[in-house]
Curated annotation (Swiss-Prot):
Residues 333-343 have a biased composition (Low complexity). Coiled coil: none annotated. Pfam families: Ist1. ESCRT-III-like protein involved in cytokinesis, nuclear envelope reassembly and endosomal tubulation. Is required for efficient abscission during cytokinesis. Involved in recruiting VPS4A and/or VPS4B to the midbody of dividing cells. During late anaphase, involved in nuclear envelope reassembly and mitotic spindle disassembly together with the ESCRT-III complex: IST1 acts by mediating the recruitment of SPAST to the nuclear membrane, leading to microtubule severing. Recruited to the reforming nuclear envelope (NE) during anaphase by LEMD2. It is found in: Cytoplasmic vesicle; Cytoplasm, Cytoskeleton, Microtubule organizing center, Centrosome; Midbody; Nucleus envelope. It comes from Mus musculus. This is IST1 homolog. Disulfide bonds: none annotated. The gene is Ist1. The lineage of its organism: Eukaryota, Metazoa, Chordata, Craniata, Vertebrata. GO terms for cellular component: centrosome; chromatin; cytoplasmic vesicle; cytosol; endoplasmic reticulum-Golgi intermediate compartment; Flemming body; nuclear envelope.
Amino acid sequence: MLGSGFKAERLRVNLRLVINRLKLLEKKKTELAQKARKEIADYLAAGKDERARIRVEHIIREDYLVEAMEILELYCDLLLARFGLIQSMKELDSGLAESVSTLIWAAPRLQSEVAELKIVADQLCAKYSKEYGKLCRTNQIGTVNDRLMHKLSVEAPPKILVERYLIEIAKNYNVPYEPDSVVMAEAPVGVETDLIDVGFTDDVKKGGPGRGGGGGFTAPVGGPDGIVPMPMPMPMPSPNAPFAYPLPKGPSDFSGLPVGTYQAFPNIHPPQIPATPPSYESVDDINGDKTVSSAQIVGPKPEAPAKPPSRPVDNYNTFVLPELPSVPDTLPTASAGASTSASEDIDFDDLSRRFEELKKKT
């Protein structure tokens, strides 16, 4: 199945060009659609409802096209991420089958706006054979993305979708608008239709248990006239008894009494509290002899320390200071042999000599 005209580098470059081109087109078409919505609001304000409906179909087409471009951009990015598989494998990998077939299918439908997309499709056909490319263009192989085929189809959008667009545009621009009652009556009861029909209306209508992720919750079955009954309340658990910690395990018998009771010890009596406080010595008797009777001492009798020598007690009340000599008011006269020079008062050499003599003697 390996094609002879396949060039890997050319495919890689054009995939990147397709991604950039698609991004620019998406941005451009989104801005144009916003401006077109203002024109539709003007038509509604002027009472030109039919003209507004036709204009809305163009906007829906552009929105579909933008969504299709986003899908193709995603597939191109996927091929670039797995480009090593395209180069190394001769057969088509199953994880790339949808991406490759969708790009080949969309190339002839968008090559007028994205010319690089045709080059990408040709390279893929050269890689996986032209027969494979023919099957992809007609979707006989069945791997083309269904959502992309719906967005690029030539069918007219549903009338209910057109009315939804008109209602939203009138609401955004504060324009009065009365939707078509016939079209609104055809809408499914209880189903909120999106602005862009994604083809999930049948799934929503069918409903049924097990479709939601409610942790085992069963959806209520619809009643008559599309009225959905209120769901039954969830059963509340019965209140449990409060938690109680187990009692600590201990000896079954303790002095004949059960565990947890208290009784005073019969053989031990606390000391009696004296009725009057003990008397203390006065401060005046601090110098007196302090004797404590041996009966007041509890426990073994301590050894008596050596008695210090007694000294006469001083009587501070009769203490008299002795008379001190009077301070002389004249300086003593210098001796006759003393020299008045400060340098002759002390002879350091003589002192050093005497100090050395003392050291020798010792």
